[in-house]
């Protein structure tokens, strides 16, 4: 009897519970349906724009309509959302889809379970330090306001394009056909925003195109994890200049002074692809070129609140190496055999290749293959290249920088000042089997306009070779007793 009564009560309780849940769900659905039928959301567009502008501390306008949808779940869609800061456009998003849990309509604050963007184009403009212009991504000062708490399960990006323009160096990178997502974005509120931000995510881009005529890098992929202001980008992979690149980047914004740690490896890339964006019409018409596979790696750390401070504190190592390269249009060994180091042959022809290691496009953009006269149908085989540098306080010091051909060895000493963008005591020398300098050439000036000193280049020709060889020994001294210019890892050719 008691068992029957208990079972009847349990069955009734279950039916009552299910009826209650069903009624609540029905109320929520009817409420959402009423919103769709009777609520004109576009009338609230000015308030939405004002709320977004206040949250971002930028100017946000919604140029398209706002739409409500019920399935699959309550969603609000915004079309053609434009974000401007200090008069400059920062972003234009074709569509923003906001997924809202139905039960959150009855809470004090509306929550979003997902934000999906489509067709976003983000334009980042960076100016130099101390020029009075604010970067277009920097928000207005907070005054007494603080960032609101953030708890967003997911935000996704489809059809994303990002354009980064450095106004000081006039360089630009464009990331196309990108997609990705960020998950578990959280911030307890307060300032500064980045110091307390946490999330995880992954992104990919079909191509990365620079300003100029070079081939774009492709297949960029990276993951990112942020924990209370520390951002770890790893692994990063990319196809660039015909080679495979990988990198790791850590940015620590949790401290008073931000810090950065970067390591990059680019394996088996083609040096001709790297130098292609740097060539001018005159150098292209000269018919001279260098080609072959090379490897590059660097590991750097820096700290500072500005780009200048980062440069001044940079330290680490850089290395470039390669084998079996070809310098077309120049018979370097044939010319050196006669010591014709004149306007018709300059050590700048190979110094750009040696200096390319630590500075890549930054420094070598001032160099072209310097010899004005091309030798038709000839070339130079470069057997090995090593370019190792130590970076301290923003200055790269040559550690082991040299190359070898069939008959000769060329080496470099000196420093590269990344802070002032200048060459410091760079000397390119032709060295003998003992590492002694047989001829030297000094390079000075800014990175983009290097100046080569021709005053101490030997210019012996034809029948004067023996006489000038004796004069060379008087000036430089015997190779057995000379001051060693190069004692690095590359042996002299046999």
Predicted regions and their residues:
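N-terminal type II signal-anchor transmembrane helix
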Residues: 2-57, 478-493
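C-terminal or late-domain output modules
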Residues: 415-478
């Amino acid at each position: 009897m008691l068992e029957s009564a208990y079972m009847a009560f349990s069955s009734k309780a279950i039916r009552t519970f299910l009826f209650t849940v069903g009624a609540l769900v029905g109320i929520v659905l009817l409420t959402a349906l009423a919103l769709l039928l009777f609520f004109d959301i576009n009338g609230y567009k000015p308030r939405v724009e004002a709320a977004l502008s206040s949250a971002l501390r930028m100017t946000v306008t919604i140029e398209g309509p706002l739409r409500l949808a019920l399935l699959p779940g309550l969603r609000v869609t915004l079309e053609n959302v434009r974000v401007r800061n200090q008069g400059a456009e920062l972003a234009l998003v074709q569509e923003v889809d906001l997924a809202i849990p139905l039960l959150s309509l009855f809470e004090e604050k509306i929550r979003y379970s997902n934000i999906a963007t489509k067709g976003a184009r983000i334009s980042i403009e960076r100016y130099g330090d101390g020029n009075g212009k604010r970067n277009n991504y920097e928000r207005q000062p907070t005054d007494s306001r603080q960032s609101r708490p953030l708890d967003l399960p997911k935000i996704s990006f489809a059809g994303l394009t990002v354009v980064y323009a450095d106004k000081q160096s006039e360089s630009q990178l464009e990331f196309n056909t990108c997609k990705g997502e960020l998950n578990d974005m959280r911030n307890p509120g307060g300032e500064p925003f980045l110091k307390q931000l946490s999330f995880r995510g992954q992104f990919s881009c079909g191509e990365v195109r620079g300003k100029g005529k070079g081939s774009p890098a492709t297949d960029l992929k990276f993951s990112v994890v942020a924990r209370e202001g520390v951002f770890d980008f790893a692994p990063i992979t990319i196809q660039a200049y015909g080679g495979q690149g990988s990198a790791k980047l850590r940015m620590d914004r949790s401290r008073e002074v931000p810090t950065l740690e970067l390591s990059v490896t680019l394996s088996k890339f083609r040096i001709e692809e790297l130098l292609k964006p740097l060539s001018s019409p005159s150098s292209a018409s000269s018919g001279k070129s260098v080609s072959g596979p090379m490897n590059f790696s660097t590991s750097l750390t820096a700290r500072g609140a500005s780009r200048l401070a980062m440069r001044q504190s940079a330290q680490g190592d850089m290395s470039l190496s390669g084998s079996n390269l070809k310098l077309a249009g120049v018979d370097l060994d044939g010319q050196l055999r006669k010591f014709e180091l004149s306007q018709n042959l300059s050590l700048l022809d190979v110094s750009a290749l040696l200096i390319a290691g630590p500075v890549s496009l930054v420094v070598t953009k001032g160099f072209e293959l310097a010899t004005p006269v091309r030798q038709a149908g000839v070339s130079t085989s470069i057997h090995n290249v090593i370019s190792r540098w130590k970076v301290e306080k923003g200055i790269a010091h040559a550690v082991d920088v040299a190359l070898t051909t069939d008959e000769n060895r060329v080496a470099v000493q000196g420093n590269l000042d990344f802070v002032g963008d200048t060459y410091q005591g760079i000397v390119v020398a032709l060295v003998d089997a003992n590492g002694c300098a047989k001829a030297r050439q000094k390079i000075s000036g800014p990175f983009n306009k290097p100046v080569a000193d021709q005053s101490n280049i030997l210019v012996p020709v034809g029948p004067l070779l023996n006489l000038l060889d004796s004069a060379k020994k008087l000036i430089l001294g015997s190779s057995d007793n000379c001051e060693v210019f190069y004692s690095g890892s590359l042996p002299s050719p046999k």
